[in-house]
Design a protein with these regions (language model features):
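Active-site environment of divalent metal-dependent phosphoester hydrolases
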Residues: 105-107, 140-142, 167-176, 209-212, ...
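Extended active-site neighborhood of metal-dependent phosphoesterases/phosphodiesterases
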Residues: 63-81, 144-239, 245-251, 277-282, ...
């Protein structure tokens, strides 16, 4: 997400002590008085585990989205929610999880990322969840205490499970200002950590996971996931083109923080300028001397990379406020369909209330069902922009 503003979960078992200590560390000054915890409704999918806890918001001004940029309807509320899953996955479904901007979970020490991690492991086998893909803005201020909390919240994730990370603007620069590209990410998550999943194939820069390619054998086909840094530089795009060309036996999806806007068009500064808020080219990473690095917004990335490759079928991104959703289908140069998805929930209370996306590939090999679910609340959203299907051509497998 875009701004430059400031900014308890109960875990009883002794094995969780490290996580608890991080959660309690000097965070109260950032978020106000420590909130009490209230019992969440029992998630219908969580019968195998105790219900999650949802932290009440701090008293007074809320930690998270700064008051001066809140919309009149803040905090937003997802509509058409219910605990019942209307269309459970059929046998043979392949599932990917998308974890949009988690910055306020880290900044405010909310338990929702922990709840998401528990859910992924609890449902991994039953739902055939092959990987979880983050969409950047992992932290709010690129601060050690936030990275520590973020990492501790992922403790339930098994070493063999692919959890894919990349940077957003708030993961860069002093206090997440994106005035430059300095980040603490590599100090907490390195190649050795990523290789435990067995999916990491290569990185652009040794020791840095912001630009990385993963290969996941989902049984019916090989899925490639290309993770790209915030506002990819020209050198990054050159590397990405070479990678996708080398892995022509993979069907590839791309994840980057800022690509699609909330009106379901790509970020395009040359045509729309500041009309599209929070374009990557307006940040310090694209200003002054750094402008020579050739930063890309969505439309630039489409033309320089995405449209050129017949094996790319999907782009996912976050970053954008207001409705936080968008969907666009375009045709690549080879006639292939490329679907582009925006998902972000940080404008909800508590920075998102744990909502994530479940991207389910049905057994026909070409139809995806996109679902929105919160493990913290035990609720699905069936609003049209939260629950929908799309078809990939050519099919991923037959």
């Amino acid at each position: 997400m875009f701004h430059d503003g400031s900014s308890a979960h109960r875990r009883a078992p002794a094995s969780q002590a490290a996580w608890l200590l991080v959660a309690l560390a000097t965070t109260l000054s950032a978020c106000g008085p420590r909130p009490t915890s209230v019992q969440a409704p029992e998630p219908p999918l969580a019968a195998k585990a105790p219900p999650a806890q949802v932290a009440a918001a701090p008293a007074g001004p809320k930690c998270g989205l700064p008051e001066d940029i809140r919309e009149a309807d803040w905090p937003r509320v997802l509509t058409s929610t219910q605990p019942k899953e209307l269309a459970p996955p059929r046998p043979g479904t392949i599932t990917l999880a998308l974890l949009p901007d988690t910055q306020y979970y880290a900044a405010c020490r909310y338990p929702h990322l922990r709840n998401q991690s528990d859910f992924l492991m609890r449902e991994r086998k039953e739902r055939n969840i092959q990987a979880a893909i983050t969409l950047g803005d992992l932290t709010d201020h690129n601060a050690p205490e936030e990275w520590e909390f973020f990492k501790a919240s992922l403790e339930p994730i098994a070493d063999g499970f692919p959890l894919l990370l990349t940077s957003g603007n708030h993961d860069l620069g002093d206090r997440g200002t994106a005035k430059d590209r300095n980040t603490l990410l590599s100090g907490y998550f390195d190649e050795a950590w990523a290789k435990k999943s067995g999916a990491l194939k290569e990185v652009m820069t040794q020791g840095d996971l912001q630009n990385a390619f993963y290969s996941i054998d989902v049984g019916k086909f090989r899925l490639g996931v290309l993770m790209l840094e915030w506002s990819p530089r020209a050198s990054t795009v050159r590397w990405a083109n070479s990678v996708v060309k080398r892995y022509t036996n993979h069907r590839v999806m791309v994840a980057t923080h800022a690509y699609l806007y909330r009106d379901s068009t790509r970020y395009d500064y040359s045509a729309k300028g500041a009309e599209q808020k929070w374009n990557p080219l307006e940040y310090g990473t694209a200003q002054g001397k750094l402008s020579k690095e050739g930063n890309h917004d969505g439309e630039m990335l489409w033309n320089a990379l995405i449209r050129k490759h017949k094996n790319i079928f999907l782009v996912v991104s976050g970053h954008v406020l207001v409705n936080g959703t968008g969907f666009l289908t375009s045709q690549g140069d080879a006639g292939n369909t490329v679907h582009q998805v925006l998902a972000n929930y940080q404008m909800l209370d508590e920075g998102g209330l744990g909502y994530l996306r479940l991207l389910e590939l049905t057994p026909d090999g070409k139809t995806f069902h996109m679902k929105t679910y919160s493990p913290s609340l035990g609720l699905f959203s069936y609003a049209p922009d939260q629950d929908f299907s799309f078809v990939v051509e050519p099919p991923l497998y037959q």
